[in-house]
Amino acid sequence: MELNKHDQTKTKYDNTLIWFCIITIFPEMFYAITNYGVTGKAIRKNIINIKFFNPRDFTDNKYKSVDDRPYGGGPGMLMSAKPLYLAIKNAKNLLKSAIVIYLSPQGKRLNQKKILEIIKNKKIIFVCGRYEGIDQRIIDCQVDEEWSIGDYILTGGELAAMVAIDSISRFIPGVIKKKQSVQEDSFFNGLLDYPHYTRPKIIEKMKVPEILLSGNHDKIRLWRLKKSLEKTWTKRPDLLKNKILKKEEKILLNELKKINKR
């Protein structure tokens, strides 16, 4: 896969389930997800496909510079509007009807619900900003949504795009072998994940909970649900405010609250 060239030719990936186009001046950063882990495997299987569009390839200056001074003055530089605009337009020509997402600290906070919604699009273009940001006109005329992965500043949108792609890819059929692994992840059902244990049975005098060694699958399921609720209640109580609890979950949560009142 060539990471530094835009490609508008027809591809052989007829079975691809989801397409990503990345607008970035640092496509090499994405080797972390194109060559490794479940995303790397999914690309090799043609389950997902990633194309890169580098604004530097759309510049009209010999230095291929992609930064410019902001009108009105102020600190820092902005990404040059024209190369970025052309990169996005070319990505749109490749992925017809794709949704365009700009990674920005001003965007809506990314969560599991948004990930599950965006998968329906099948074609996604991520715009990775740099410097102090991008021209507002690009956002107004080319961007459909702005996403943020948290209330902190990064040097660019590439890391945020990788986070989003990794999370989205997990829900594409065939990427994760065991569907149950995805369904039991934190946030999938609105709760944090339960504690996990593996061999050996004892580490530094700390034992694996006996219930997990019992072989009683119903009791194990109940224990895990209780621990999941307990984790969520103590670490992320905000998640419970928006979750419609099942009868069993309500009973277990009320028991936890009573115990902690003692």
Curated annotation (Swiss-Prot):
Quick one: which residues bind S-adenosyl-L-methionine?
A: G129, I149, G150, D151, Y152, I153, L154
Question: Any idea where this protein resides?
Answer: Cytoplasm
What does the record give under GO molecular function? tRNA (guanine(37)-N1)-methyltransferase activity
Pfam annotation, one family: tRNA_m1G_MT
Which transformation does this protein catalyse, written as a reaction?
A: guanosine(37) in tRNA + S-adenosyl-L-methionine = N(1)-methylguanosine(37) in tRNA + S-adenosyl-L-homocysteine + H(+)
Q: Which UniProt keywords apply?
A: Cytoplasm, Methyltransferase, S-adenosyl-L-methionine, Transferase, tRNA processing
> Known InterPro entries for this protein?
Alpha/beta_knot_MTases, tRNA_m1G_MeTrfase_C_sf, tRNA_m1G_MeTrfase_TrmD, tRNA_m1G_MTases_N, tRNA_MeTrfase_TRMD/TRM10
Q: Which domain of life is it from?
A: Bacteria
Q: What class of enzyme is it?
A: transferase
Question: Mind telling me which Gene3D superfamilies this protein's record contains?
Answer: 3.40.1280.10, tRNA(m1g37)methyltransferase, domain 2 (1.10.1270.20)
Q: Does the keyword Translocase apply?
A: no
Q: What is its EC number?
A: 2.1.1.228
Instruction: Spell out where the chain crosses the membrane.
Output: none
Keyword flag Iron-sulfur: no
**SUPFAM superfamilies from the entry?**
alpha/beta knot
- One GO process term, biological-process aspect: tRNA N1-guanine methylation
Q: Which coarse location class describes where this protein primarily resides?
A: cytoplasm
GO CC field: cytosol
The family note in this entry says:
Belongs to the RNA methyltransferase TrmD family.
Q: Which PANTHER family match?
A: TRNA (GUANINE-N(1)-)-METHYLTRANSFERASE
Function summary: Specifically methylates guanosine-37 in various tRNAs.
Q: How does it assemble?
A: Homodimer.
What is this protein identified as? tRNA (guanine-N(1)-)-methyltransferase
Q: Which organism is the protein's source?
A: Buchnera aphidicola subsp. Schizaphis graminum (strain Sg)
What gene name is listed for this protein? trmD
